[in-house]
A protein has these predicted regions:
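A feature for loop-to-transmembrane-helix boundaries and adjacent hydrophobic helices
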Residues: 1-349
Length: 349
């Protein structure tokens, strides 16, 4: 089934199908492809930048895998919890190929389970959250285009030039599940706000701002807090335009996601102000990451000599990426040599 999607004010129209291609009897949806594409871009970004945050790439992979898998599961559970009456069987709950993920559920799940995975793999938690915040913006910016192919997550009527119209928007707005503030009327035959586009643009603008701020960050967790504030602020006003989310206070048009977004903004701003004042007098120092190989060697040395420690090396966060790479490689070479010599001594003894 295809949808004719039109932007009348711009003179544009697109014939869209939710299904990108099929493998046998299995349909592969654009929604899933957009999410997968965003995830791949976020992974590339994380691998390129992790050294600047004192994170070893090999250990980071385990954290990301756990965070992604359980984050997606949390996103689905959050979505189902918002409208449990739409799901009759466990198979309905598990059917996510064609949509049905709540971003805030994914964010919460990824931070919680990703944080636990960091503890397990010895990855610094707050620097990982900083990196994840930028990764989220990449994934969310790309993933929202899945809503475009599905023709979902759009807003109320608009007369703006970029207003969007399709049979899917018309059919949905004629249904009984539309949620709009009291006093707001909807005309199914009129164009609607392409809120997926608003959020995608908002995410990529936020990404550019946070990347520019990497060298200026004041404390570990700084970028993660700014991510929460930026995304929360955008989500709050974009959500007000939506017609498909749960209204908590119909008379005010207040939605569940707006409440979460407001809490993220208020809490994030308060913490940002407090921590910036606390750490403004000294530059942020990044502890260089040990490779997985060196941590394994260190564990062997600890078995024979529990009190043995490896000297840490730090670098100012504002240092160039090239310097981080050079110093991290040199540091790990020295540590590897030191640990191998220590193991040889123990073996000879």
């Amino acid at each position: 089934m295809t949808n004719l999607v039109q932007f009348p004010g711009l003179g544009l129209s697109f014939e869209l199908s939710r299904v990108a291609f099929s493998i046998g009897d299995i349909d592969i949806y654009w929604y899933g492809i957009c999410i997968a594409f965003g995830l791949c871009l976020a992974l590339v970004f994380a691998f390129r930048r992790c050294t600047e945050f004192g994170i070893d790439a090999d250990s980071m992979v385990d954290v990301i895998l756990i965070g992604v898998v359980l984050g997606i599961a949390s996103a689905r559970l959050y979505y189902v919890a918002m409208a449990p009456y739409n799901y009759n069987t466990i198979w309905d709950v598990l059917a996510v190929r064609d949509g049905g993920l709540a971003i805030y559920g994914g964010i919460i799940g990824a931070f919680v389970f990703g944080g636990l995975a960091c503890k397990w793999r010895g990855v610094p938690v707050l620097p990982m959250f900083d990196l994840a915040g930028m990764g989220f913006l990449i994934g969310q910016g790309c993933g929202r285009w899945g809503n475009f192919f599905n023709q979902e997550a759009f807003g109320c009527n608009t007369t703006l030039p970029w207003g969007m119209f399709s049979e899917a928007t018309e059919d949905y707005l004629m249904g009984s599940t539309v949620t709009v503030p009291k006093g707001v009327t909807i005309d199914p035959a009129m164009p609607v706000h392409p809120t997926f586009l608003y959020e995608s643009i908002w995410c990529f603008v936020g990404l550019a701002l946070l990347v520019a701020y990497i060298k200026k960050r004041k404390f570990n967790g700084d970028i993660a807090l700014r991510y929460l504030v930026w995304y929360g602020a955008g989500r709050f006003w974009i959500e007000a335009l939506r017609t498909d989310s749960l209204l908590l206070v119909p008379s005010l048009g207040l939605r569940a996601s707006q409440l979460v977004a407001a809490a993220a903004v208020v809490g994030g701003v308060a913490l940002e102000i407090f921590l910036t004042r606390k750490y403004k007098s000294k530059p942020l120092m990044v502890t260089l990451a040990l490779t997985a190989e060196n941590r394994s060697l260190l564990a062997k040395v600890h078995k024979a000599e529990p009190e043995f420690t490896v000297e840490r090396e730090e670098l100012v966060a504002s240092s160039p990426r090239k310097l981080f790479l050079e110093r991290t490689n040199a540091y790990n070479e020295r540590v590897k040599q030191q640990l191998k010599e220590k193991l040889a001594e123990k073996k000879d003894a």
